[in-house]
Amino acid sequence: DVDSMQLISIMKNMRDAGVLASGDPLTQPAPFFIGAAWTPFAPPEEFRVLRLAKKIEAGADFIQTQAVFDMKRFATAVAAAQEMGLTEKAAILAGIIVPKSARMLEYMHANVPGVEVPDALIKRLAAAKDQRQEGYQITVELIQAARKIPGVKGVHLQAIESEEVLPEIIKSAGLLPRPQV
C-alpha cells in the first residue's frame, strides 16, 4: 500500500526521471501534471497545512480543496500555507460545491469530514423562496470571495447532478472571458 504522498512521489519520478517505482525505466517520461487534495478543516486542523506541505514537497503541482463554505476560515488556512511558501510552489484551487438546498448543506456539515458550513449560510438558504436560485447566488459569492484570497489561484467548481447551471454561475461570478495563457 502507498499513501497519497508516496503516490505523488512515484508520479513525480515517472515524470521527471522517467522511472517506475520499481526502478525500471520508462520508454519516455510520463507527462503528468500532478494534483492532490487538501482538507483544511479536518481535525486536527493544526496539522492540515503540514500534510499539505508534504504533498507539495512530494511533487504536487496543484491542490484542490475539500468543499469550502467558510471563506474567512479558509483565508486563514491559506495564509498559513502562504507563510510556509506553499502557495508559490503549487496552485491552490478552492473547492466550491453549488448548494441546492439547506438540507444539502446540513447533510454535508454533519456527514462529510472536513466540511464546515456556517449556520448563517444554512439559515439563509432555508429562508429563501427558491433555494436552488439562492444556492446559485451563494456559489457566485463564494467564488468571488475565494478569488480575493491571496494565494488562491482558482476554484474547483462542482454542481452535483446539476451541471447545466455552471455556465450561468461562471458568467455571473465574472470568470469570463477566460484569460489567455
Regions found by a protein language model. Give the residues of each.
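Active-site pocket-lining/capping segments in soluble small-molecule metabolic enzymes
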Residues: V2-T27, A37-A42, M84-Q144, A173-V181
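Active-site glycine-rich loop that binds ribose-phosphate moieties when present
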Residues: L20-A21, P44-A58
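Short, well-ordered secondary-structure micro-motifs
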Residues: E46-F47, A75-T76, R103-V112, P167-E168
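Conserved, mostly hydrophobic/aromatic
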Residues: K55, G59, A94, V155
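Structural motif
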Residues: A58, I149-P150
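Catalytic beta/alpha-barrel core
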Residues: D61-D70, G154-A159
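Glycine- and Gly-Pro-enriched alpha-helical subdomains that act as flexible
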Residues: T76-A79, A94
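C-terminal/domain-terminus segments
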Residues: I149, H156-V181
